[in-house]
């Protein structure tokens, strides 16, 4: 199997990223597909890596969806679900505030996720500008998963986002992340989610106002598991079998 990772930049800023795990004979076709993903860019980096010992995860997190009339209501609900997942309310509220203001210490977005101590709210990622990226995950049969989600009523324009985000959230749980908070930095996309082993993958709209280019991810973890979780998130390859 091969891991194929695409990263696109425009004027020095990250604008698009995607990843696939495919058999060797599908590498060329997949690279061409990933090159079509960024809408605008001045630099694209494609990495192809041979993988060993790919773990099969039987099922993804179950999907639930909720719509609210305001960002305030949506975020309050997100906090309640994070509390249900085991995150203390002050820590959940701190994470919301962090993503709202921009998690990069220099202002704006990070390339990866914040790692937050679930008990204290302390930031644990070694590089607070870069963060931690969850990589080397995909679906065993991506085409089949797309068809199933279409039949469930997921709109075509949201499919790729949902499939990619659900794979990330599922791998995070596999690696020991206790809960996750996320919303996109895409100004036009206001749906975010919270996720965890006990709450599933919970889509929530709107987690921010339209036109806001700030977003990111917060992973809630136990501090004593930091090194093990980082290694798993960044290095352990997994394929998800089914929904």
UniProtKB/Swiss-Prot annotation:
Classification via Pfam families: BioW
Keywords for this protein: ATP-binding, Biotin biosynthesis, Ligase, Magnesium, Nucleotide-binding
GO biological process: biotin biosynthetic process
EC number: 6.2.1.14
Domain of life from the UniProt record: Bacteria
Pathway noted in the entry: Metabolic intermediate metabolism; pimeloyl-CoA biosynthesis; pimeloyl-CoA from pimelate: step 1/1
GO molecular function: 6-carboxyhexanoate-CoA ligase activity; ATP binding; magnesium ion binding
Catalysed reactions, as listed in the record: heptanedioate + ATP + CoA = 6-carboxyhexanoyl-CoA + AMP + diphosphate
Cofactor(s) essential for the protein: Mg(2+)
InterPro entries: BioW (IPR005499)
Family: Belongs to the BioW family.
Subunit structure: Homodimer.
Protein purpose: Catalyzes the transformation of pimelate into pimeloyl-CoA with concomitant hydrolysis of ATP to AMP.
Entry protein name: 6-carboxyhexanoate--CoA ligase
Organism listed in the record: Thermocrinis albus (strain DSM 14484 / JCM 11386 / HI 11/12)
Gene name of this polypeptide: bioW
């Amino acid at each position: 199997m091969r891991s194929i990772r695409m990263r696109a930049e425009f004027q020095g800023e990250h604008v698009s990223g995607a990843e696939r795990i495919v058999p060797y004979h599908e590498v060329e076709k997949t690279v061409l597909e990933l090159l079509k993903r960024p809408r605008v860019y001045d630099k694209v980096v494609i990495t192809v890596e041979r993988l060993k010992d790919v773990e099969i995860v039987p099922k993804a997190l179950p999907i639930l969806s909720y719509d609210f009339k305001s960002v305030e209501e949506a975020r309050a609900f997100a906090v309640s679900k994070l509390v249900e997942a085991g995150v203390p309310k002050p820590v959940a509220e701190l994470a919301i505030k962090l993503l709202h203001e921009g998690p990069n210490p220099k202002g704006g977005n990070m390339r990866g996720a914040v790692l937050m101590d679930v008990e204290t709210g302390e930031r644990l990622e070694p590089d607070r500008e870069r963060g931690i990226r969850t990589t080397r995950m995909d679906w065993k049969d991506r085409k089949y998963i797309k068809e199933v989600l279409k039949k469930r009523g997921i709109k075509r324009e949201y499919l790729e986002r949902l499939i990619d985000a659900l794979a990330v959230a599922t791998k995070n749980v596999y690696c020991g992340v206790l809960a996750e908070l996320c919303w996109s930095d895409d100004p036009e996309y206001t749906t975010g989610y919270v996720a965890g082993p006990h709450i599933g993958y919970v889509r929530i709209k709107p987690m921010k106002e339209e036109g806001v280019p700030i977003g990111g991810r917060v992973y809630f973890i136990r501090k004593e598991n930091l090194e093990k979780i980082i290694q798993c998130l960044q290095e352990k390859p997994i394929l998800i079998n089914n929904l």
